[in-house]
Amino acid sequence: MKLLTTICRLKLEKMYSKTNTSSTIFEKARHGTEKISTARSEGHHITFSRWKACTAIGGRCKNLCDDSEFRISYCSRPTTRCCVTECDPTDPNNWIPKDSVGTQEWYPKDSRH
């Protein structure tokens, strides 16, 4: 199977809904100061790389997002944004297999299956 490099907006929303019971990477970053102060009092240090988090979900850190991209969070500083490409659901290159049910069927990345 071809390695896919595009992540769709609805796919990310689906991923978020599956993980909303626990903190996502960006929620953890937002609440990082509370965790760091607690960790320091215990002698532990938490490091978080927004750039690594952005690239881990297929995004790119840059100053401005293109028209075909949307911003998720900031990268290393407030002027640098994590931009993720919004894919075209009609493009078969943006489809993923329904491997979770053990079939060979394919469906668009951004569908609600």
UniProtKB/Swiss-Prot annotation:
Keywords in alphabetical order: Antibiotic, Antimicrobial, Defensin, Disulfide bond, Secreted, Signal
InterPro entries in alphabetical order: Beta_defensin_dom
Keyword Disulfide bond among record annotations: yes
GO annotations of cellular component type: extracellular region
Organism: Pan troglodytes
Name this protein carries in UniProt: Beta-defensin 112
Highest taxon of the lineage: Eukaryota
Disulphide bond pairs: 54-82, 61-75, 65-83
Pfam family for this entry, one: Defensin_beta_2
